[in-house]
Structures are given as structure tokens and as C-alpha cells.
From Swiss-Prot:
Pfam families for the chain: Ribosomal_L31
GO molecular function list: metal ion binding; rRNA binding; structural constituent of ribosome
Keywords: Metal-binding, Ribonucleoprotein, Ribosomal protein, RNA-binding, rRNA-binding, Zinc
Gene it is expressed from: rpmE
Organism of provenance: Pseudomonas aeruginosa (strain ATCC 15692 / DSM 22644 / CIP 104116 / JCM 14847 / LMG 12228 / 1C / PRS 101 / PAO1)
Cofactor notes: Binds 1 zinc ion per subunit.
Reported function: Binds the 23S rRNA.
NCBIfam families for this protein: L31, PRK00019.1, PRK00528.1
GO annotation (BP), single: translation
Protein name as catalogued: Large ribosomal subunit protein bL31
Residue numbers binding Zn(2+): 16, 18, 37, 40
Length: 71
């Protein structure tokens, strides 16, 4: 095997926009910023919102529902 061909794998800190700091390891070798993490993501916090897109779906069915009708 060749020596010194692999990038360095160092400990870094990933900081979320909510302020949570996650310590991990990466070949990036510099701190990174995260938009969401498990502390603030709605799926993990249980604060999910159901988006109502029924109006758009009904409008689509009105326009193109005729093409999908069975004969």
C-alpha cells in the first residue's frame, strides 16, 4: 500500500443554527455550520406541520383528470 495517500481524519465541531454543537470526525478538517440538527428538526422534536395542498391537487385533477379516465 502507498503511504500518505489518504486525507487526514480529524475531530471537528459541527454547529447548528439553533446553537447545538456536535462533535464528530471528518476529512474536511475545519468546523462546519448546519442548518438543522436532531435538536431542532421538526421530525425529531414532534412539532411537524401538515401542509394543506388540497387546493392545488384539486386544480390539477380538474385540468388533467379527463386524460386519466378509464374507457
Amino acid at each position: 500500500m502507498k503511504a500518505d495517500i489518504h486525507p487526514t481524519y480529524e475531530a471537528i465541531e459541527a454547529t447548528c443554527s439553533c446553537g447545538n454543537v456536535i462533535k464528530t470526525r471528518s476529512t474536511l478538517c475545519k468546523p462546519i455550520h448546519l442548518d438543522v440538527c436532531s435538536e431542532c428538526h421538526p421530525f425529531y422534536t414532534g412539532k411537524q406541520k401538515v401542509l394543506d395542498t388540497g387546493g392545488r391537487i384539486d386544480r390539477f385533477k380538474q385540468r388533467f383528470g379527463v386524460f386519466g379516465a378509464t374507457k
